[in-house]
Amino acid sequence: DHMVTGGLQVMDGSIDNQLDNHAHQSPGDVMKTIPNASAFYSQKINDDLYAGIGLYGNYGLGIDYGSWAGDRLIKKSTLVAMTLSPSLAYKLNDHLSIGASANVNYGYFSLTRNVNDNDYRQHDEDWAMSYRLGLLMQLTDQTRAGITWNSETNYRYSVNGKARVQNGAYDLPVSAQISAPQQIMLSLVHDINPRWSVMGDLGWQDWSQFGAPQIVVGDRQLNNVSRLKDTWHGAVGVQYRPTPQWRLNIGVAFDSSPYESQSDVALTLPTGDEWRFGTGAQYQITPASNIGIAVSYLHMQSSHVKSPTAFAGSYDHPYLWFASVNYSYQF
């Protein structure tokens, strides 16, 4: 009637930035290793009602440009979001269940720049609410379908200070507003036989309303939100159960680029079309406990930065990899 799950995750990769003006020093690989952790608890209230709570890292990105031509504008940046998610699920009948959660989100943003040949670090944090609704349908004995809606999450960060860029010195606010867009996800699982299952999902994200990281110098907004568009997600996977103790998974996913043009992306948000390839395994240690591991590789579309013009350049063939381990215990 009770279950606890704990997990550890790590993300790394290569995001290489090369300036168009080769007379200037390029940042090179700006990616930093990002560790993460998660914990979940669920409890059966009665035959139809379940309650749970989760604490997990929603997303994170650490970039380190080092000592480069634009280090007076940005040298290092870290963005982290953690979520506390209490939830309820209710079984309406043998074919239909509903679920909902109210998420308390904590966001942290830091920015380090070169000021008078010294690292000047500023940071800010914010709290935001978001919500999730879900519907699970048992279509047949072998087929299940679900739909999930996640609301938009708005973070607002404000960091004030002085920045000295190539064409002059300014007293300016450096600001960033990060919004995680609302999304809808459809999913389907079909058990072919006791050993094989196939699954897939299709999703949409409202990135056209997303606030891209903004750097404002005087009255000039260097990163323009109008460059963004909605995105689509698709994934397919297979699960194989060779024995009652083992579950083996493999899958591939695609996410379309949020940018209208890959030749005009934000300096601090290099992304594009993404292909992810993953595999994992779960082992039932005892009737009450299991352990799982997973690894995945993400290939990202190349992109080009137009503004600020002095630091125009390219992110060529970026990639990320992810690894995770989790343990669950029922009691």
Residue positions per predicted region:
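Transmembrane beta-strand segments of Gram-negative outer membrane beta-barrel proteins
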Residues: 1-14
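Outer-membrane beta-barrel porins/channels
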Residues: 19-26, 33-331
